[in-house]
From Swiss-Prot:
GO terms for molecular function: ATP binding; metal ion binding; phosphoribosylamine-glycine ligase activity. Keywords: ATP-binding, Ligase, Magnesium, Manganese, Metal-binding, Nucleotide-binding, Purine biosynthesis. This is Phosphoribosylamine--glycine ligase. Its EC number is 6.3.4.13. GO terms for biological process: 'de novo' IMP biosynthetic process; purine nucleobase biosynthetic process. The lineage of its organism: Bacteria, Bacillati, Bacillota, Bacilli, Lactobacillales. Gene3D superfamilies: 3.40.50.20, ATP-grasp fold, A domain, ATP-grasp fold, B domain, Phosphoribosylglycinamide synthetase, C-terminal domain. Its cofactor is Mg(2+); Mn(2+). It holds the Pfam family GARS_A.
Length: 412
């Protein structure tokens, strides 16, 4: 069987790598992919993730047995709808269901309607009433652009000036709507589930690190590292999240005529009042995918085929140890990342997922985005895995790049 993964980052590299482990998979294509993936024998295809017609044609010509969608932009662009219309097997939500991520306001309205615990909020489509609400509520508050913002459309404001500036930025840009939420304090974690026809197959939870610098300092990013599982979040808490968040949301989407197929990401926070929902994503997270998927012992391709066919999938996960991943980013990220930096030589035996990379005229891998690659390691516990991973990472010639030195420290 041939598989097509849509997307170009570290998440898609992790998906492609996992699919290649399947004995029934002969070839894995990634569109558009990146040059780093070729080291693993993955075929990269020069088709944009937003070119639905070309992707459909490629899948037909290559007789692709399964397509898996990575990024939210492709989902919101209706790639799943295009494949379904062409009667091609694809795993991901259609455009209507992807609205759970595509609009923060829509997601909040679903949570409110179906009793899913989340922060109190208000939505505004112009600046003046939003500023008035700000004055009324005071800080801290969380300000979110309604639409897709590549993981960077959220500002946690602890002072009024930051809040006003965030609102001004959102309304002066392409976003015409903003959600203002109460600030929730607690321990954040990510719960991914495979979903189809109302059936839910949860994965081990992960915790990612959004801030750019050590000690959770600096601006928000798409994620600077992650680890899985999160042992200080109990099984009881995870069950509470499934019962109170994932199940009613999946059932609610069916009720709304927007049945969800694909990977549902619940961004959660354990507060003094129990689990609350921060956000939903309609796909795997990045970098969490790179630490969750290596823990799957079963055949991912077969599991997805079974889920789509309505059969019970085999999903067995590593029961001990921890998988840790650290993102290496180009200096200047998340605002103006340096492009064209030559990547260090990666020694054999280092598990790497490439993201923002391309090749120069000398066939060397160079940085072409903010988050450049992720190095992962699996070990007995967070502390020993951290030590192992950072010893290897610190030996690399990472001039012009930076990474956090404390990924996983919350678990120690």
């Amino acid at each position: 069987m041939k598989i097509l993964v849509i997307g170009s980052g570290g998440r898609e590299h992790a998906l492609a790598k996992k699919f290649m482990e399947s004995p029934q998979v002969e070839e894995v294509f990634v569109a558009p992919g990146n040059s780093g993936m070729e080291k693993d024998g993955i075929q990269i295809v020069d088709i944009s993730e937003l070119s639905n017609d070309k992707l459909v044609k490629f899948a037909q010509n290559q007789n692709i047995g399964l397509t898996f969608v990575g990024p939210e932009t492709a989902l919101m662009n209706g790639v799943v709808d295009a494949f379904i219309k062409a009667e091609l097997p694809i795993f991901g939500p259609n455009k209507m269901a992807a609205e759970l991520e595509g609009s923060k306001d829509f997601a909040k309205s679903i949570m409110k309607k179906y009793g899913v615990p989340t922060a109190d909020y208000a939505t505004f489509d112009s600046l003046e009433p939003a500023l008035a609400y700000l004055d009324e509520k005071g800080v801290p508050l969380v300000i979110k652009a309604d639409g897709l913002a590549a993981g960077k459309g959220v500002t946690v404001a602890f002072d009024i000036e930051t809040a006003k500036s965030a609102l001004a930025d959102i309304f002066s840009g392409s976003q015409g709507k903003v959600v203002i939420e109460e600030f929730l304090d607690g321990e954040e974690f990510s719960l991914f589930s495979f979903i189809h026809d109302g059936k839910i197959y949860p994965m081990p939870i992960a915790q990612d690190h959004k801030r750019a610098f050590d000690g959770d300092k600096g601006p928000n990013t798409g994620g600077m590292g992650a680890y899985s599982p999160v042992l200080h979040i109990s099984k009881e808490v995870v069950n509470e999240a499934l019962e109170k968040v994932v199940k009613p949301t999946v059932a609610g989407m069916i009720e709304e005529g927007k049945s969800f197929t694909g990977v549902l990401y619940a961004g959660l926070i354990l507060t003094e009042d129990g689990v609350k929902t921060i956000e939903f994503n309609a796909r795997f997270g990045d970098p969490e995918t790179q630490v969750v998927l290596p823990r799957l012992k079963s055949d991912l391709a077969q599991a997805i085929i079974d889920i789509l066919a309505g059969n019970e999938p085999t999903l067995e996960w590593l029961e001990s140890g921890v998988t840790l991943g650290v993102v290496v980013a180009a200096e200047g990220y998340p605002s103006q990342a340096k492009l064209g930096l030559i990547l260090p030589e990666i020694p054999e035996g280092l598990n790497v997922y490439y993201a923002g990379v391309s090749k120069n005229e000398n066939n060397q891998l160079i940085s072409s985005g903010g988050r450049v690659y992720l190095v992962s390691e699996t070990g007995e516990d967070v502390k020993s895995t951290q030590k192992l991973l950072y010893e290897k990472l610190d030996k690399l010639e990472n001039d012009g790049f930076f990474y956090r030195h404390d990924i996983g420290s919350r678990a120690i």
